[in-house]
Each structure stands twice: as structure tokens, then as C-alpha cells.
Amino acid sequence: MPNIKIKAIDIYHPNHVIENDFYINHFQKKGRDIQHFLEVMGREKRYVIDKVEENGLTMALEATKRVLERAGMTGKDLDYIEFSTQVPETTFPINAMYVHAEIQADHDTIIKDSNANCAGMTVAVEQASRYMLANPHIHTALIVGSDYNSLIANPEQEITYANYGDAACAVILEKTDENTGFIDASYHTDSVFKDKINYPAHGLTKAVKGKSDVQAINWLPFDGNVALPPTYKMIDQLLARNGLSIKDIDACCFSQFALSNILKIQDHYQIDQEKIIYVGDTYAYTGTSSPFIALYEGIKSGRIKRGDNVLFWTIGSGFQIVAMLYQY
């Protein structure tokens, strides 16, 4: 029986770095002290686009070219391309069309864009893995996740403005006879917070017709801790149905949205520190690509090796949580 493995992974981020002092000073001028907030979120610096010629699409193109080079492949070797983003540079055509053109992929290559907000790239990899297992004609897939977060971050709200960074990540999935790769995934969706994080703030229709602001995300306060009990239940069920325990997990690549969330999950399961891959202090929160940038850095540092069981966990606005098991 075939399996789907991660053949290669690479990233791209802008060169421009902004450290915490900029945001501390920005909000001090508004009469707010965000130093404790930055500590809770685990922020130190972030990469932010500062060139007019850069955007979410250009970042994705660069990450794509890098991962193809790393894998020793060309666009002609790809059967499937999926672009995960919540900040698409265009909606007509889809962003994946530009990726297809840039790498000169074949005419029979399937292409699509997808959006599951911050859970997007994890969802895309999970769905592509299952599709590849079901379709005998699909042997390779490119999944690229890219969000130009700073473009729509709200300078009046530290939860986005001081918390987000810009980056792209690309992975190559490959069908293999090796006993490795995709294991399983589980979802939990509760739409209770559907009106708490909005962009455009009042919908596309009003934004296009000039009846509301389209410049930034509007984020209303809510208690994100409600996502933790279903997270624990979901992870427990996912491990149990695959004959695993938390001790069998070699590395954890979680959403980098908030260090506090990672620490709560770590404490709940008593996960060893060396298994927690944290990159939010360097990259801040990169949205859709977040858990996979953690994977990239874990591999790069030697903390994640071939054969390791990796647990992914992430959350999308609204909210939807996703946990995925992959043997790297």
C-alpha cells in the first residue's frame, strides 16, 4: 500500500527585520503598554515586507523555486499544486496559476487555491495527502502557504500589528512504498467566534462599494482558552486510533500564534522541551505556514530526523482546530 511522504521543505521570508521596540513605542504613543502581551505571545522579532515589489505571491514563488531545487525537481515533475493563503494577491486568476506559470508545470497538472485561515497549510497538506492516496495518477504535489500578514495587520490592535510576520513555506509531497509519511488527522469546528476576526471587517460587498474600511483586520476580544479542551480530546482520539501515545511523538510543530498556547499543551501532556519546536520568537506569527516553518527549522537544526513522528496542531479563526500526524 502506498504512503505519502514529505520529500522536501523550504521557506522564504523578507530581509527586513522589526524588533519589539518598534511596536512598544508605537502603542506607548497611544497610551498602551504591550510589553506583557509580547511576552505572553513569545515575540522578539519578525520579518516584514518593506519593498513594493514583494507580496504574498512573490514570497510563494521564491519558496517554491527553493523547494524544487532542494528536491532536485522541476515544475514538470509536479502532478498537483495547491496554494494556501488567506491574503491572496488575486482572486482572478487563482494564485496557483502564477506558480504554475513560473515553474513551467505541465498542462495536466491540477492547480488550486485554498483558504482555511491560519489552519490553511495544515489542512492543505492533509487533504492533498488523502487525495494522492485515492488518485492513482497523482504521484507528486507542491503545497505552498504564504500570507502577507503585515499588509492587513491593524495598527490600532496589537493582536495583529505586533504579533504577525510575513513568510512563505513550500513542501513537496511524494507517493512512496516506504513505510513512512502521512498517518492521520482530526478536526474540531465550533463557529462560536465567527464574528470575532473579520477581514474585510464588514464583508467584501461593503468594502468594494466604499461603505466600509478595507485596510485592516478587525479583531474583537474573545477567550481563546475555549479551544484547549477540544484540542486535548481531539489529540487523544487521534493518537488512540493510531495505536500511539504522546510518548511516541518525537516533535511537535504547533501554531506559533501564541507561546502561551504551546506551553499549555506542553504542560497538559508533559511533553519534553526538546520535542517542542518554537520559532515564534524569530518569525512571529506567519499565519497559514506557521506549523510548517516550525517543521523546517526543526529539520534544519537536526531536532527532527527521518522516521520521526511529528504532531501538528493549529487553529483557524472562527474557530477550527486541526491535529495531524506525519512520520517525517
What are these model-predicted stretches?
Residues 57, 61, 87-88, 101, ...:
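Claisen-condensing/thiolase-fold acyl-transfer catalytic domains that form or cleave C-C bonds
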Residues 12, 84-89, 116-119, 145-151, ...:
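Acidic, glycine-rich active-site loops and adjacent beta-strand->loop/helix elements
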Residues 6, 52-116, 238-262, 266-268:
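Conserved beta-ketoacyl condensing-enzyme motif
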Residues 31-39, 90-105, 143-149, 204, ...:
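Acidic-glycine-rich active-site phosphate/pyrophosphate-binding loop
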Residues 1-52, 157-225, 233, 328:
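Condensing-enzyme catalytic core mediating Claisen C-C bond formation in acyl metabolism
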Residues 133-167:
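Flexible, glycine-rich active-site loops centered on histidine and acidic residues
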Residues 6-8, 37, 67, 78-81, ...:
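Buried hydrophobic positions in well-ordered alpha/beta secondary-structure cores of metabolic enzymes
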Residues 18, 92-93, 125, 152-156, ...:
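Short acidic, glycine/serine/threonine-rich loops at helix termini
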